[in-house]
Amino acid sequence: MDPVLGLGLFAFALLLLALPLAFWKVSSEKTSGLVTLLIATANLALTAQLVLRWWQSGHFPISNLYESLCFLAWACTLTQLLVERSWPTPIVAAAATPMGLGCIAFASFALPDQLQEASPLVPALRSSWLVMHVSVIMVSYAALLVGSLLSVAVLVTDRGHALELRSSSIGSGGYRRAALATPLGNVGDSEVQLSSVKFTRNELLDSLSYRTITVGFLLLTVGIISGAVWANEAWGSYWSWDPKETWALICWLVYAAYLHTRLSRGWQGRRPALVASAGLVVIGVCYIGVNLLGIGLHSYGWFFG
């Protein structure tokens, strides 16, 4: 077996073991040290896979759909580990592991053999912009996907109850309101420092989701801008309304709407989580769906390994 494919399957096996273990630890409310170890080992295996493919091909391993899926799985597991450093809980693994698992499964079992092999770069990708643009876009997708999955976890753990989350996300200014009794017996609002407040599980999930999506949105913005500059150098136009470009813009607008609703503090709880969840579908169309169409400047990923 090709060692590149073998490393991918090894990472798949580790994540496949980590996922049910994470759900079991969530239900039993136990710590997630073993789950984190499995995910970290899977990330190391994916790192070795990408380095080996880079050595085999002689170029940055993100030139076809197989390589980009493996890179996305690596970025998702790394993002997941970074999020768990802020809040070491199996809920994060239970919510985010399916994304990395799905990426590896699709790359290893769904793609034709010829697309799993290393191949020369197509002419459009023979540029120094490859690493800057494509890798930043893929890392932004990873952050947005993990953040959106955490929003899905908010909706699932909410179990249909109305939420009014006031977490330490951007827009709260480091404070949240708490109802306090006044000397006259009335109930008034007072600003309470976040460091003195014990957050609920949903508040922590909401805050982590928001922060992760914010990072992903900023990276997506950088990726789109760098892609426009690259397009101008390659084809003489910053924007051509290629299907991938159009859906990248739609993706940017969806998450811009999510951040706007949070920053304005007009929406809290379930509604912004629903917007973030919709972003999962938009990224899926932008990343995979457009490639299946086989049209446009970005269609090389599926049909032309």
UniProtKB/Swiss-Prot annotation:
Chief location of this protein within or outside the cell: membrane
Presence of the UniProt keyword Cytoplasm in the record:
no
Q: What NCBIfam families would the database entry show?
A: cytochr_II_ccsB (TIGR03144)
Name any GO cellular component annotation. plasma membrane-derived thylakoid membrane
Pfam families assigned: Cytochrom_C_asm
UniProt subcellular location: Cellular thylakoid membrane
Q: Which UniProt keywords apply?
A: Cytochrome c-type biogenesis, Membrane, Thylakoid, Transmembrane, Transmembrane helix
Q: What does this protein do?
A: Required during biogenesis of c-type cytochromes (cytochrome c6 and cytochrome f) at the step of heme attachment.
How does the record say this protein sits in the membrane? Multi-pass membrane protein
Name used for this protein in its record: Cytochrome c biogenesis protein CcsA
> What does the record give under GO molecular function?
heme binding
Per UniProt, subunit arrangement is:
May interact with ccs1.
What the entry lists under InterPro entries is as follows: Cyt_c_assembly, Cyt_c_biogenesis_CcsA, Cyt_c_biogenesis_CcsA/CcmC
| Biological processes, Gene Ontology terms | cytochrome complex assembly
So what family is this one in?
Answer: Belongs to the CcmF/CycK/Ccl1/NrfE/CcsA family.
Transmembrane portions of the chain: 4-24, 32-52, 58-78, 91-111, 136-156, 212-232, 246-263, 275-295
